[in-house]
């Protein structure tokens, strides 16, 4: 057998074999369609629905996250405004309290000065009265001594005793 004979025999198509292959292929397609195509198609549909649901869920979650972020931003802004207001109120109260304390201290100082001036004036008046009394007593004592020179010894003794007695009282 030559190469040409082998080559010619290999190109020869057998109609019976081709028909048999065609029937087997058709049966195989029917079996695949009946047993595998439905489950594969169902699996692909489920996968498609899952992808769609996941995309919808992701979009919904993104919107929720944006809403939550906006709410938190608004709450943070509100908190900052409240903090600023609280600080402003605290400063105003501190200034008011400081002014009240200074005014009260000034009033207390004025009252203390007034009381000190009154006490000083009273002490001065008492000192002057005491000095007058002492000057009067000294003058009287001097006058008595001058008069005592003209008195007898017994009159002088009585006068001294009387003077000492008056000092004790």
Curated annotation (Swiss-Prot):
Matching InterPro entries: ATP_synth_b/b'su_bac/chlpt, ATP_synth_F0_bsu_bac, ATP_synthase_B_chain
Q: Which UniProt keywords apply?
A: ATP synthesis, Cell membrane, CF(0), Hydrogen ion transport, Ion transport, Membrane, Transmembrane, Transmembrane helix, Transport
* One function term, GO molecular function aspect: proton-transporting ATPase activity, rotational mechanism
Q: What stretches pass through the bilayer? A: 12-32
Listed under GO cellular component are: plasma membrane; proton-transporting ATP synthase complex
Q: Where is it localised?
A: Cell membrane
Membrane topology per record: Single-pass membrane protein
Predominant place of localization = membrane
According to its UniProt entry, what is the function of this protein? Answer: F(1)F(0) ATP synthase produces ATP from ADP in the presence of a proton or sodium gradient. F-type ATPases consist of two structural domains, F(1) containing the extramembraneous catalytic core and F(0) containing the membrane proton channel, linked together by a central stalk and a peripheral stalk. During catalysis, ATP synthesis in the catalytic domain of F(1) is coupled via a rotary mechanism of the central stalk subunits to proton translocation.
* Subunit structure, as described in the record: F-type ATPases have 2 components, F(1) - the catalytic core - and F(0) - the membrane proton channel. F(1) has five subunits: alpha(3), beta(3), gamma(1), delta(1), epsilon(1). F(0) has three main subunits: a(1), b(2) and c(10-14). The alpha and beta chains form an alternating ring which encloses part of the gamma chain. F(1) is attached to F(0) by a central stalk formed by the gamma and epsilon chains, while a peripheral stalk is formed by the delta and b chains.
Q: Which family does it belong to?
A: Belongs to the ATPase B chain family.
> What name does this protein carry?
ATP synthase subunit b
| Originating species | Lactobacillus helveticus (strain DPC 4571)
In the record, what lineage is assigned to the organism producing the protein? Bacteria, Bacillati, Bacillota, Bacilli, Lactobacillales
Q: Which gene encodes it?
A: atpF
